[in-house]
Amino acid sequence: MKNINFLKSNLIAHRGLHNLEIPENTLPAFYKCVDKKYIIELDIHILTDNSIVVFHDHNLKKLTGVNKVIETLSYPQLSKIKIDKKYTIPTLKQVMHIVNGKVPILIEIKDMNNNSKFEEELVKILDNYKGEFAIQSMNPFVIDWFYKNRKDYIIGLIVFNDLNYNIVKRYVKKIDFISVYKKQLPFKINKLVLGWTIRKESEYKKYRKLCDNLICENIL
């Protein structure tokens, strides 16, 4: 039986411990999580050369000023583009190397292609990782793929509207947990429930007893 209690071991840092000086989803943000013992939540994309990198948006413009879609680049191309003209967008391998099992990692897969290449490349990395991790996605295709090919992995579905609620009912037997938008809490389901994203102390007090754990930023 899967042990998913690590998802409740501490609060979850949304895209790492970032602030005005340290951007989200960067190595310094993840180093801080390791130091403070927070669970890391991060986002991943696959590039044209099958490198897997840690970044939230599909377009780079917001954090880098470069108006390019991240999935259209190779890693050598992406590595020349900096966040705040200073920080390199890290690969998942780099992040896992510095974390090295010291804290759990919650990985959101940003896959909209539904062709399985992303998942196949990802498990080449995760199969050899000794630390605790879980996978989550808004895309039901991702849930299906992992249920078929890696049933031992801990898998969650991200819920953000009524459409996803209907999907949950269809996929409840295939998932180990759900990540629910805070305004949909409490969410009645016989699974571990994470709430996202908590950005104020008042929200923390309001939602902390309505789910099993919270994904937070600004308040950690």
Which residues are covered by each model-predicted region?
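Phosphate-group recognition and catalysis centered on beta-loop-alpha active-site segments
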Residues: M1-L220
